[in-house]
Amino acid sequence: MVQTTEAKQVCRAASTVLFPELEFGVKPCGKYTREDFSEILSRIAFDQEFANTGGKTLQLDRDEHVDITATARNSLAKSLLYHLRNLSTDAITDQFDGVRDRVFEVLRSQRRLPAFVDVAIDLHEWRFYGSADTDHVLTTYPDLGTNKAFCFATLCIVAPRTRFTLAVVPMDANGFRAKRDAVRSLLETAKQYVSIRHVYLDRGFFQVHVVAELEQQDVEYIVRARPSSGMKDRLSVGAETVADEYTMQRKRKPTAAVDVTVFAVPHRTSEDEHVWFVTSLDVDSSTARAYAAAFRRRWGIETSYRQLGEFLPRTSSPTFSVRLFYFLFAVSLYNLWVLANVLASAETVPETPLISTRIFRRFVLSTDYG
């Protein structure tokens, strides 16, 4: 059981990791302050709202005069977006790197980091309804009325209640080169903070150059596979599992080849179907099910993505710096919510979060943004 006072303390302590790191390039003579921008960002993140609405509600709560029927953009929201549009990518990523550093300083000081962690790499698509020619917008599968999206590769810890997002890489393309480079960057960043035991990747990363990069990074991995006919031929009629040596290769330039173990287990819900993987681990038919079960833990990341979405502001902006800032701000708030629950849980990790996102919102919104 967590008392109100204790919950408030850990939530506000977590928030002090974030807000002092935020910089917007505000001039001393500006109409609005860094604290104003931090507060409106928090509101639109927790409420999943547009900046214009968030600016109006914030000023109404301050008893300031606001024309709620005005069609022109709210002045506070307009100023926030102006400053975000003028931030460089490096200026944005540097400050959120600082937030991550402080999160892990707290975890180390509290001795809450395990000796080794499993991690999952995945793609997070933020759907876009504007022009396909917009910078950083990729064409992807149709969903929610569009086939365009801003895309971010993420690396997360795979463990109940401690699913921190360790690294984020914006994607400028969706080919194998971009994915290979993203995997390299994510792993190199993650290794600065944790010791990696296994890396799990979904079928979107089942490409020989990506697997070759995993080998180069010297990490143990399991990748969900799209089975070729050569793979399927290894499964005997009536067999439930299979594990065998296999060579992934690309014969067209740029060529690549990687020796892996391929294994398959029965699909959990579809009869006569199997789920296929490639791995660097020593897997045989007797251990294939156990490794497939270990891979299923990465599916908990889907829950993390939904919870991350609870901190993502709404926007129709085509400007990449706005999207990047919003996404990294959401990741930071999500990580701080996880951190608050870690700090509130003493020595044990509960099955469900002690502090809900709604309670976290209430305590953070009442904090000092200085």
Question: Which stretches of residues belong to each language-model region?
Answer:
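Major-groove recognition helix of helix-turn-helix-like DNA-binding domains
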Residues: 66-89
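Domain-level cores of phosphate- or acyl-group-handling catalytic modules
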Residues: 176-232
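Short, solvent-exposed helix-loop connector elements
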Residues: 26-28, 286-295, 307-327, 344-348
